[in-house]
Amino acid sequence: MTTSRGNMDGGMCASTTRGLLAGGYVNPSPYARVNLIDFITIATTGNSTDFGDLTVTGQGPGANSNSLRGVFGGRNNPSKQQVIDFVEIATTGNAVDFGDMLNVFSDCAGTSDSHGGLAE
């Protein structure tokens, strides 16, 4: 990871070529939530690389993806957040605001297929 995170608590998603990790927090002290997105290239060994940033910092985002887009929803900063962000997995850059979750969540779980995703 580009920044050491003692306890990850981030959301992960992937395409067939890249894996992304977003959010989480730096621990030990000073305890700080982050908005970082890192990626790895699945077919090669090596360190992760900076992908970009989420729109807000936080730990515990749920994540979904298909082969093109990764979506991160909900997080804790320090209160629960409704924000949903998305990225285009094939290109690096900052996340874009997708909208808001109907309810406020953190420490979400997500799953998806090639057509849509669910978060809880």
Model-derived features: positions:
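Polar, enzyme-active/binding microenvironments
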Residues: M1-E120
